A protein has these predicted regions:
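C-terminal substrate-recognition "lid" of short-chain dehydrogenase/reductases
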Residues: 75-102, 107
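Catalytic Tyr-x(3-8)-Lys segment
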Residues: 58-78
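Catalytic tyrosine of NAD(P)H-dependent dehydrogenase/reductases that use a Tyr as the general acid/base
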Residues: 14, 22, 94
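Rossmann-like NAD(H)/NADP(H) cofactor-binding core
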Residues: 35, 40, 98
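Short, flexible catalytic-loop segment of classical short-chain dehydrogenase/reductase
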Residues: 43-54
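Active-site loop immediately N-terminal to the catalytic Tyr-X3-Lys motif
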Residues: 4-12, 71
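Active-site helix of classical SDR
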Residues: 17, 25
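Alpha-helical segment proximal to the catalytic Tyr-Lys
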Residues: 30-34, 93
Protein backbone atom coordinates (compact mmCIF):
# COMPACT_ATOMS: atom_id res chain seq x y z
CA UNK A 1 0.00 0.00 0.00
CA UNK A 2 1.31 3.38 -1.01
CA UNK A 3 1.47 6.22 1.54
CA UNK A 4 -1.12 8.24 -0.41
CA UNK A 5 -3.62 5.39 0.02
CA UNK A 6 -3.46 5.44 3.80
CA UNK A 7 -5.90 7.63 5.63
CA UNK A 8 -5.35 9.73 8.69
CA UNK A 9 -7.55 10.40 11.68
CA UNK A 10 -10.24 12.95 10.96
CA UNK A 11 -9.96 12.76 7.17
CA UNK A 12 -12.28 9.89 6.26
CA UNK A 13 -14.77 12.00 4.28
CA UNK A 14 -11.97 13.79 2.44
CA UNK A 15 -10.24 10.48 1.66
CA UNK A 16 -13.51 8.96 0.47
CA UNK A 17 -14.12 11.87 -1.89
CA UNK A 18 -10.64 11.46 -3.42
CA UNK A 19 -11.24 7.71 -3.81
CA UNK A 20 -14.58 8.45 -5.48
CA UNK A 21 -12.98 10.74 -8.05
CA UNK A 22 -10.35 8.11 -8.84
CA UNK A 23 -12.91 5.32 -9.13
CA UNK A 24 -15.43 7.18 -11.23
CA UNK A 25 -12.69 8.48 -13.53
CA UNK A 26 -11.58 4.95 -14.34
CA UNK A 27 -15.12 3.54 -14.51
CA UNK A 28 -16.40 6.16 -16.93
CA UNK A 29 -13.63 5.35 -19.40
CA UNK A 30 -15.32 2.05 -20.28
CA UNK A 31 -18.67 3.74 -20.67
CA UNK A 32 -17.68 6.86 -22.60
CA UNK A 33 -14.63 5.93 -24.69
CA UNK A 34 -16.80 4.38 -27.43
CA UNK A 35 -18.23 7.89 -27.91
CA UNK A 36 -14.71 9.36 -28.20
CA UNK A 37 -15.03 11.04 -24.81
CA UNK A 38 -11.85 11.08 -22.73
CA UNK A 39 -11.98 10.98 -18.94
CA UNK A 40 -9.01 12.07 -16.82
CA UNK A 41 -8.54 13.68 -13.43
CA UNK A 42 -6.07 15.74 -11.45
CA UNK A 43 -5.08 14.52 -7.99
CA UNK A 44 -3.48 17.44 -6.19
CA UNK A 45 -1.22 17.08 -3.19
CA UNK A 46 -1.21 19.74 -0.50
CA UNK A 47 -2.33 22.92 -2.27
CA UNK A 48 -2.48 26.23 -0.40
CA UNK A 49 -6.18 27.02 -0.28
CA UNK A 50 -8.70 28.37 2.19
CA UNK A 51 -9.40 24.72 3.10
CA UNK A 52 -5.93 24.34 4.58
CA UNK A 53 -6.04 27.80 6.15
CA UNK A 54 -9.15 26.69 8.02
CA UNK A 55 -8.43 23.03 8.78
CA UNK A 56 -4.62 22.73 9.04
CA UNK A 57 -2.34 24.35 11.56
CA UNK A 58 0.66 26.35 10.35
CA UNK A 59 2.87 23.79 12.09
CA UNK A 60 1.28 20.88 10.21
CA UNK A 61 1.60 22.69 6.88
CA UNK A 62 5.26 23.45 7.57
CA UNK A 63 5.94 19.82 8.47
CA UNK A 64 4.23 18.76 5.23
CA UNK A 65 6.22 21.31 3.21
CA UNK A 66 9.50 19.96 4.56
CA UNK A 67 8.56 16.39 3.52
CA UNK A 68 7.83 17.39 -0.09
CA UNK A 69 10.91 16.91 -2.31
CA UNK A 70 10.33 20.32 -3.94
CA UNK A 71 10.20 21.88 -0.43
CA UNK A 72 7.07 23.90 -1.07
CA UNK A 73 3.32 23.53 -0.98
CA UNK A 74 1.45 23.66 -4.24
CA UNK A 75 -0.73 26.47 -5.51
CA UNK A 76 -3.88 26.52 -7.61
CA UNK A 77 -1.70 27.85 -10.44
CA UNK A 78 0.33 24.62 -10.31
CA UNK A 79 -2.80 22.75 -11.41
CA UNK A 80 -3.61 24.98 -14.40
CA UNK A 81 -1.05 23.53 -16.84
CA UNK A 82 -2.02 19.90 -16.20
CA UNK A 83 -5.71 20.78 -16.57
CA UNK A 84 -5.08 22.53 -19.89
CA UNK A 85 -2.92 19.61 -21.05
CA UNK A 86 -5.55 16.99 -20.22
CA UNK A 87 -8.32 19.14 -21.71
CA UNK A 88 -6.53 19.56 -25.03
CA UNK A 89 -7.37 17.11 -27.80
CA UNK A 90 -4.15 18.14 -29.55
CA UNK A 91 -1.86 17.59 -26.57
CA UNK A 92 -3.52 14.59 -24.94
CA UNK A 93 -6.00 13.17 -27.42
CA UNK A 94 -4.96 9.55 -26.76
CA UNK A 95 -4.85 9.85 -22.97
CA UNK A 96 -7.83 8.60 -21.01
CA UNK A 97 -8.47 6.98 -17.65
CA UNK A 98 -5.51 8.68 -16.01
CA UNK A 99 -5.16 10.35 -12.66
CA UNK A 100 -2.41 12.97 -12.96
CA UNK A 101 -0.80 13.73 -9.62
CA UNK A 102 0.22 17.33 -9.04
CA UNK A 103 2.09 17.17 -5.76
CA UNK A 104 5.75 18.17 -6.03
CA UNK A 105 6.75 14.56 -5.39
CA UNK A 106 4.91 14.55 -2.06
CA UNK A 107 4.14 10.82 -2.15
CA UNK A 108 7.39 9.49 -3.64
CA UNK A 109 8.71 8.05 -0.39
Amino acid sequence: MCIRDRGSAGSSVYAASKAFVSGITRSLVSELSPYNIRINAISPGTITTKFHEQYSSPEKLEATRLKIPMKRLGSAEDCVGPIIFLSSQTMSGYITGQILEVNGGQFIS
